[in-house]
Regions:
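Terminal-tail/helix-coil boundary detector
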Residues: 45-49, 69, 73-106, 110, ...
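Acyl activation and transfer enzymes in specialized metabolism, enriched
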Residues: 105-121
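Glycine/proline-rich, positively charged
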Residues: 1-34, 49
Length: 340
């Protein structure tokens, strides 16, 4: 299976559930190195290759922009430039880009190649990268012949050191691969998702509770909801209560059997989907309770919890309990308060 813009947690869910993943297409460039941390560690461990796009940051990592004034919005005349200008702003601004371009120019002159060649060679040299995807506008610009030059030279230690020094003040983009499409700030051409979709449907359908004017609930379709007579989540006024949730797909498929952090990822996805379906958001969650089959899994599951909630920091309690049913290793419940 080939993936696009998967973050590390969700790539691992697929692997731990038994799917044969061979590649993940993600942004990798001198400006965006999110894929070079945990993602690289895991894909190297599992024989997966990264297909890198955004390598030239919409053309900003080329000679064209060296020593040029920062462009205004009217000069960003295509979707790609509009998108990657936001990457530049988030990573430290126009002057930091110029510092990188000057270093790339110095390296390019040493090897008698283009700045784009150097920027691309740097990405190809990353151990997890199997290929780069370089865009072309057939009616405007294409650089197929120049791109072949990438294979005519290598970056030596002096080159790599100079490039690394130029990136010393670059701010790391928040989050993981693909988060620019999932969480604000959206690093897209428009700064939101409006040019990708009109609206995002809820995962679960809210259902009014008969006889209760201020109460709605959602169901995720597990067999336990039917057996036990409970909803996945219920909203009363501005309060949303999410039932203890396990890594169950559909009626009874256990996700990531035997893997606690993988189960935690799937569970928190379901909790987030439940809260959003009832009009809330992840940032509205004020309390979570985590139940573990084994205390040894506490740190791994807590790291997943921390990556999900970040600065939200809900109140939390984590317990080791005597037993969970079947092969579940984690169960999580949550409470949210929707303001406004």
């Amino acid at each position: 299976i080939g993936l696009t813009n998967f973050d590390t947690d969700h790539l691992l869910v697929l692997l731990r559930h038994g799917f044969p993943v061979v590649s993940n297409q993600v942004v990798v460039s001198l400006l965006d190195q999110r894929a070079l941390g945990d993602m690289t560690t895991e894909v190297l461990k599992n024989g997966i290759k990264l297909f890198a796009y955004g390598v030239l940051a919409g053309g900003f990592l080329t000679e064209r922009w060296l020593d040029k004034p920062e462009p205004g919005n009217s000069e960003l005349n295509d979707w790609s430039k509009m998108k990657y200008k936001r990457f530049i702003d988030e990573t430290g601004g126009w002057e930091n880009l110029q510092i990188i371009l000057r270093a790339l120019t110095s390296v390019a002159q040493r090897h008698d190649v283009s700045v784009a060649n150097v920027a691309t060679r740097w990405v190809l040299d990353q151990p997890a990268v199997g290929a780069v995807i370089i865009g072309a506008r057939l009616t405007e610009s294409q650089h197929r012949q120049d791109n072949l030059t990438i294979f005519s030279f290598v970056l030596d230690e002096e080159d790599k050191s100079l490039i690394a020094e130029s990136m010393a003040d670059i701010c790391r983009l928040k989050g993981d691969c693909g988060d620019e499409y999932r969480e604000p700030p959206f690093l897209t051409a428009t700064g939101d998702l409006s040019h990708h979709l009109d609206s995002l449907p809820t995962v679960y359908e809210p259902i009014a509770v008969p006889g209760k004017t201020d109460r709605t609930q959602v169901f995720s379709g597990t067999k336990w909801e039917k057996i036990c007579g409970h909803s996945r989540a219920v909203r009363i006024g501005n309060r949303i209560l999410v039932s203890g949730t396990t890594a169950t797909h559909g009626q009874d498929v256990i996700v990531c059997r035997g893997d606690a952090p993988g189960q935690a990822v799937y569970i928190l996805d379901k909790i987030k989907a439940s809260v959003m379906s009832l009009g809330g958001s992840l940032s509205d969650i004020v309390r979570t309770r985590v139940y573990l089959q084994n205390a040894e899994d506490c740190e791994a599951v807590s790291l997943v919890h921390g990556r999900y909630f970040g600065d939200v920091c809900p109140a939390n309690a984590t317990f080791e309990i005597s037993q969970l049913i079947d092969d579940y290793l984690v169960e999580i419940e949550a409470e949210a308060i929707v303001e406004g």
